[in-house]
Amino acid sequence: MSRFTEKMFHNARTATTGMVTGEPHMPVRHTWGEVHERARCIAGGLAAAGVGLGDVVGVLAGFPVEIAPTAQALWMRGASLTMLHQPTPRTDLAVWAEDTMTVIGMIEAKAVIVSEPFLVAIPILEQKGMQVLTVADLLASDPIGPIEVGEDDLALMQLTSGSTGSPKAVQITHRNIYSNAEAMFVGAQYDVDKDVMVSWLPCFHDMGMVGFLTIPMFFGAELVKVTPMDFLRDTLLWAKLIDKYQGTMTAAPNFAYALLAKRLRRQAKPGDFDLSTLRFALSGAEPVEPADVEDLLDAGKPFGLRPSAILPAYGMAETTLAVSFSECNAGLVVDEVDADLLAALRRAVPATKGNTRRLATLGPLLQDLEARIIDEQGDVMPARGVGVIELRGESLTPGYLTMGGFIPAQDEHGWYDTGDLGYLTEEGHVVVCGRVKDVIIMAGRNIYPTDIERAAGRVDGVRPGCAVAVRLDAGHSRESFAVAVESNAFEDPAEVRRIEHQVAHEVVAEVDVRPRNVVVLGPGTIPKTPSGKLRRANSVTLVT
């Protein structure tokens, strides 16, 4: 067995901890030993279906109580798991089926495992000639034990954001998971006997699948897991579960914490729940906005939320999950730098007066990872030099599976180009400024879309997290940009004119450049990934 599966199966046999699912209406708790026994039955069914070492299996299941034993069963069979993108009630199933079959063909899936609430997809998949297995049928099989699996066998094929159309899957090995899991254990100062993890993150995203399902299953950690739909129906369920189970650890993207802050102010009163047990509230998967963190701390103070609990972090599917964690108990650490020097000279010079930019530091690198910052000539930059972040280490993916075949992620020396622009502080802490492909270059200045979007989001009437800055004329000598925002008042001409004017005003005040145009759209118009990130490249048609 690999180190990953050996430790996971050992902890399943010895741990008294487990996983609570089904909140808020039908909570049920299974110990990791019970999850393992269910996995052995599913593994028996997989063996009968011909699934074995090296096979790839797609999974379309919505409930963590079924995803956990299914994932473990696939690893017992030496197979790898791909969580397929899930259709929503508004999804055109015919279009979804075509996109999904493209992914299934690319990964050469041996079968697809389907469970509630996606059983409606079974006839569609079978019509396409796919072998479909259900969790219910697999659970009825005779249990078997694990087969021998190597360190470099694939465990996960993580679909990247926006994978439909031109899909790409990040290949994650047993070695990758083991290395990143052990590093996160140290970085989070994890205590198996005391810590309780609470999560609503989706299992089709790396933070939900790896960080808040695979990792607790691997270490035998106590986990309370609900679905994204549960969170969307009642944002405060997140806080209620932390209170009920005395949760100590959670994680989410920046937008979710901003939404929680709003709900705490509008719908809760002190005494409704206690958040003082929370010691590790990781913010990742999208840029961490210091103002949003500070707003959450202000809204959460009456409920016992401690400033030291907030933990900005940096990660990506290509490193299995995590790259750096802020130091435990340090809280938000802001690096305030001269915005003009940052834009013009690509230097992050500390400043407290004049035109400054506040950036969240994302902590030191986790163990077994190295980072360097590279300039446009390929030279390594010193501390506070802004360039492309490159990474190297044992948790780093060997590469991607694409429609054209395998593409290695690492150069001949093992370095991976993240596509992120950022710098390292004198202490070696990571700071991310933006994505190379999204940066707008005007008159030799680097203008970051996140700055524009933050300014647009300050305008009254703009929906939170629903402003996107789009680069125009990319590749020409003179670039420009446009801004699209969503508003509930998109059909009111007077309100639209006001919002357009105020967005332009706020953007000029923030970055000293006027957008070519501002477009006000209805709710749900701006394209986002399944995990809620803005799809800037896909937004061009909205503003042109």
UniProtKB/Swiss-Prot annotation:
Pupylated at Lys-528 by the prokaryotic ubiquitin-like protein Pup, which probably leads to its degradation by the proteasome. It is an enzyme of class 6 (ligase). GO terms for biological process: fatty acid biosynthetic process. Its EC number is 6.2.1.-. There is a cross-link at residue 528 (Isoglutamyl lysine isopeptide (Lys-Gln) (interchain with Q-Cter in protein Pup)). Pfam families: AMP-binding. InterPro entries: AMP-bd_C_sf, AMP-binding_CS, AMP-dep_synth/lig_dom, ANL_N_sf, FAAL/FAAC. It comes from the Bacteria. GO terms for molecular function: adenylyltransferase activity; ligase activity. GO terms for cellular component: peptidoglycan-based cell wall; plasma membrane. Disulfide bonds: none annotated. Keywords: Isopeptide bond, Ligase, Ubl conjugation. Belongs to the ATP-dependent AMP-binding enzyme family. This is Putative ligase Rv1013. It comes from Mycobacterium tuberculosis (strain ATCC 25618 / H37Rv). The gene is pks16.
